[in-house]
Amino acid sequence: MRNLPIIALDFKSADEVHTFLNKFNEPLCVKIGMELFYQTGPALIKSIKKRGHDIFLDLKLHDIPNTVSKAMEGLARLDIDLVNVHAAGGIKMMEEAKKGLRKHNADIKIIAVTQLTSTTERQLHEEQNIQTSIEEAVLNYARLTKKAGLDGVVCSPLEAKMISKELGSDFLKVTPGIRPKGAARNDQQRITTPEEAKTLGSTHIVVGRPITQSEHPIDSYHKIKESWLS
């Protein structure tokens, strides 16, 4: 996966995606989430790859180990660069996910979601019944992910530094919750700017609405790209 900002393609149809991508004349890194993949299926991945873009397939698989392994065997046949599971599924599930993926593809990176960037500490305590800080909960899931042999995690940029310190800078930290200065928070809770994410140790950033819903998406993308790569 190239070290470019990953654009979250939060659209409802393939037509909307292609209308958006037609604005760009350069290779991009894009994220296809559940909403879009379940609407369009593998056909959209093929058409995006023909354009020369890198793809993060963000399905956050979480099921019994055998089911996730078989699902990954199918996803391994797609021309994607990065895929993920939920770390809450446990070490065995993550190990089987990687085994399923590797049966057909040795190049796709696989990472695990720690805590969603929309999660608050109140939700962590009251709804998930995890009685630690968000930081400790995220670090615990990151440790399990590393032990399972995966390539990295999805986390907030705010947790990237401590994960790098304990698990190494090469361990991927793919971080959503990125907002340029002055941008709306939306449903994200633990957010930073692209510059802050880089300083904190993020290896990749994911940006959606500040680009896709911008009146000038190309300009917005290039500003974020410049601040991330500078």
Curated annotation (Swiss-Prot):
GO terms for cellular component: cytosol. It catalyses: orotidine 5'-phosphate + H(+) = UMP + CO2. GO terms for molecular function: orotidine-5'-phosphate decarboxylase activity. GO terms for biological process: 'de novo' pyrimidine nucleobase biosynthetic process; 'de novo' UMP biosynthetic process. It holds the Pfam family OMPdecase. The keyword rRNA-binding does not apply. PANTHER family: OROTIDINE 5'-PHOSPHATE DECARBOXYLASE. Catalyzes the decarboxylation of orotidine 5'-monophosphate (OMP) to uridine 5'-monophosphate (UMP). This is Orotidine 5'-phosphate decarboxylase. It comes from Staphylococcus epidermidis (strain ATCC 35984 / DSM 28319 / BCRC 17069 / CCUG 31568 / BM 3577 / RP62A). The gene is pyrF.
